[in-house]
Amino acid sequence: MSASDASQANSGTDAAMPAASHAERRALLATCVAAAARGAEVVRAGAERRPTLEWESKGRFDFVSEVDRDSESALADVIAQRHPDATLLAEEGSPDAGTTRGLVFVADPLDGTTNFLHGVPWYAVTIAALVDGVLAAGATINVATGALFTATAGGGARHAGAPMRVSGITDPARSLIATGFPFSREEEIARYVPMLPAVMRATAGIRRAGAAALDLADVACGRYEAFWELRLSPWDLAAGLLLVREAGGLITTLDGAPCPVAETSCVAGSPVMHAWLLQTLVNGEP
């Protein structure tokens, strides 16, 4: 699929009509915000005792701490109180990742765990609500700064309560691009590294901050012109996907297909810069 085909395939909203009413989407957003805020409280408290925290490896360079688990438990309690019949799909302990029926919340209780463990103040709590597989609402909180990014399907995206839009910069030479490094699979590292030179030569810079949920939020609010990563989990992606779409951006896989709430590759940006980045990544040249 070409970049232009991708733009047509991903018009900025879910292909399906929202499965929830406007009032239901607003109520689900309120739950997302409350749950994310509760998780963020736990993470902030954990940051104060960071040097003594217990943490372990889930896989190659993939870490989890007691704070991840405590944050997930806290946000799960908020969801259970408000929506006792809902399913929670979260990073540290979740049911079948293929669950799409009914009301499903998808959450990362601490996106940017490695940053958190090293005292780098760039990590988030992020959560989205889906109704019968269709994104309805999402919220991401930058725990270190307190910045809140929210969106509802068809209702737009907001930052600190104000509407937000993707960047209007269309010249790659003036653009700032975000990315995430592959770290656990050798074949993905081999695929990723050749992508860098073409993007580096044509843009004002590349940033790798280590928290995809915040990268996508920053695309949605116009700080970055575009973002790409070879593999994201549904909890990394769900809220950010809705933020970018509702802020007027495009988000697809590296194949140019509409981005699912699943383990997938991701290319996101303003319509012009998404098309440019997708072409550059696929062809190796602007």
Feature-to-residue mapping (PLM):
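N-terminal subdomain of lithium-sensitive/metallo-dependent phosphomonoesterases centered on the IMPase/IPPase/PAP
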Residues: 1-110, 286
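Residue-level signal for inorganic ion chemistry
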Residues: 43-46, 68, 79, 113, ...
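A short, compositionally biased
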Residues: 50, 123, 151-155, 245, ...
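Solvent-exposed alpha-helices and their adjacent loops that cap or buttress functional pockets
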Residues: 56, 97-99, 132, 150, ...
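Generic detector of well-ordered alpha-helical packing
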Residues: 69, 73, 92, 109-112, ...
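DPxDG-like acidic metal-binding loop motif
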Residues: 99-158, 173
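An extended, acidic
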Residues: 165-286
